[in-house]
């Protein structure tokens, strides 16, 4: 294969190709094409007033100056939103290391090799922290993950549960409100009922096919759900947990007390 042929496929069309394409659609130039397709009232008649280009160092300094205008305050929102720090080793070796998004390979041109490795590292870390055998490559947020867990558990109902029409999910009352809201939005169209209550008063029944717990809960309390999980499993009821992933570096991971599904929250770094 000639090098110029390979290059032309990646560099794009040349002047001759452009001329052929313009003739095909009935115009003589790109300017005429723009005149006929872009309304005159939104076209800029004078050249863009762009500043002179910056080097990478100059641009980084400029962005840092702009960011310095922001005022960062301590947040007391809670409910999953906490102040965090970014260790220098993470910032340098992950966020500021271009190898994670520039290492392309000939056979995987649409995804960088660095991103694939980062996703594998992420999944490995999630499995280690949660003590779960599998992990996906994350969703939008904890609330979305919890809603997906409910949908998954609904689809995985046993034949007996499907025959009995089991459509109730027990949700502990100390779940984060935003998580409950998204779960409700996703559950209603599927005919799933979310029943909120105290987990210590939960009693399994034929209509309940799954449970969702918060760990730690909205009050900041760290509960031991081992006995609850055993009771649920005895009734063929699956258990999903919405947990703070960072807390699992110290707390007993859900996988060790029998959770079936796990949705986690990764806090933003400041």
Predicted regions and their residues:
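Conserved PLP-enzyme active-site core in the AAT-like
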Residues: 144-265
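N-terminal entrance/gating region of PLP-dependent enzymes' catalytic architecture
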Residues: 36-121, 127
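Structural signal for hydrophobic packing residues in well-ordered secondary-structure cores
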Residues: 41, 63-71, 123, 127-134, ...
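Gly-rich Lys/Arg/Thr-decorated short loops/hinges at beta-loop-alpha junctions or inter-strand turns
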Residues: 97-109, 127-132, 163-166, 194, ...
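TRNA-binding/sensing appendages of the translation machinery
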Residues: 27-41, 259-260
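Short loop-beta-helix segment that forms the pyridoxal 5′-phosphate
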Residues: 107-111, 128-148
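Charged, compositionally biased N-terminal leader segments and the immediate start
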Residues: 1-13, 17, 21
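Positively charged, low-complexity/disordered segments
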Residues: 266-270
């Amino acid at each position: 294969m000639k090098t110029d042929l390979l290059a032309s496929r990646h560099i794009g069309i040349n002047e001759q190709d452009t001329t052929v394409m313009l003739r095909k659609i009935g115009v003589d130039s790109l300017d005429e094409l723009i005149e006929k397709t872009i309304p005159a009232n939104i076209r800029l008649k004078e050249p863009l007033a762009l500043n002179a280009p910056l080097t990478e160092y100059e641009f980084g300094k400029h962005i840092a100056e702009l960011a310095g205008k922001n005022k960062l305050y301590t947040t007391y929102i809670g409910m999953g939103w906490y102040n965090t720090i970014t260790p220098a080793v993470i910032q340098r070796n992950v966020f500021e290391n271009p190898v994670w998004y520039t290492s392309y390979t000939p056979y995987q041109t649409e995804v960088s090799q660095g991103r694939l490795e980062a996703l594998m590292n992420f999944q490995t870390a999630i499995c280690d922290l949660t003590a779960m055998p599998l992990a996906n490559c994350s969703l939008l947020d904890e609330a979305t993950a919890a809603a997906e867990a409910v949908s998954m558990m609904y689809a995985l109902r046993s034949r007996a549960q499907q025959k009995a029409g089991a459509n109730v999910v027990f949700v502990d009352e100390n779940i984060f409100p935003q998580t409950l809201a998204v779960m409700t939005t996703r559950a209603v169209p599927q005919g799933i009922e979310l029943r909120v209550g105290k987990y210590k008063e939960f009693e399994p029944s034929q209509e309940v096919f799954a449970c969702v717990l918060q760990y730690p809960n909205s009050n900041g309390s760290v509960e031991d759900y081992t006995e609850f999980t055993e009771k649920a499993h005895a009734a063929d009821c699956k258990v999903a947990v919405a947990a703070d992933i960072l807390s699992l570096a110290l707390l007993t991971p859900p996988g060790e007390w029998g959770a079936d599904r796990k949705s986690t929250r990764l806090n933003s770094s400041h």
